[in-house]
Amino acid sequence: MVLPLVLRRVSVPTIRQGVKRGVILALLAGAVPIPDIQATRQTPAATAFICPMHPDVVTRTPGTCPRCRMALVPSDPFDAREYIVETAARPSAPVAGRPFRLRLTVREPTSRAVVRELVEVHEKRFHLFVISQDLALYQHVHPEQQPDGSHVIDLTLPRPGVYRLYSDFLPLGGTPQVVPGVLVTAGADPDLAAPLHLTTDTAPHVAGGMRVSLTLPPDGLVAGRDEKLRYHIEDAATGEAISDLEPYLAAFGHTLVLSGDTLHYVHAHPLELLPEPGQPVHGGPDLTFKALLPKAGRYRVWTQLKRRGVVSTVAFTVDVQSPSGR
């Protein structure tokens, strides 16, 4: 069943967390005119153009991001409202191992009207992450929009339990949203406060014929600091460094970082960009992801890579220390 709760955006800094902070700082620096804040809250309208992945890139006019070449999108940086996502599963209590349909409806927070216009980000308008309560199971899927404006996806969950849903989207003229939800299958013990026992795991992992190694900063990961997660990828059979990674959703990789309490979420992409049009499109063997992790604790890291037409996922568990604990 889907728990009857009002879903709100994750109140955490994410890779997109700087959207409001970064854009507002740019506005105060004179990058774009400052609108009437009260009027903006009542009648949101685009007042700037931002990069969905680098929110401190702000301009008055359309264009592309100088860092990632992603198209800038219209945004109202003073629209701090949290959009609503209504979820409905059919059957209402999905059975593990059997397909079911999940419908997600994005609603405007004031009028509660269905939001139909979402901006395409990394080739999709709606990114949905489905993660088991124990952080062992992970899916990154893309619901399709229906004539009524809702988004639908058919899923199969491998085992009973509580699953966290993260709806990641950008309303046209608004700011990026990450809206959390909860899905409970038939036969699950819906103890949302159950303690989580994660063990640190930074050893190399093999998936899709690739051996993926993760290197952390020499002094470890520190909360509140821009960090770099560095990956080296080899062929699992030969041990040779690979150079044939393929683009997946307009990037050479996708990484999701989630805190053990499931409250802090980062969706990141490699610093290594896809080549210019007309150039060979192959990546590897090294990729670097930037992440700002807001608090100390243990985090689960999933990274998706595509090679030879197959998307594979590797998972690591890392510790983040507090600045005072260094």
Please report, for each region that a protein language model flagged, where it lies by residue:
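Intrinsically disordered, low-complexity terminal tails/loops enriched in metal-binding residues
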Residues: V2-R326
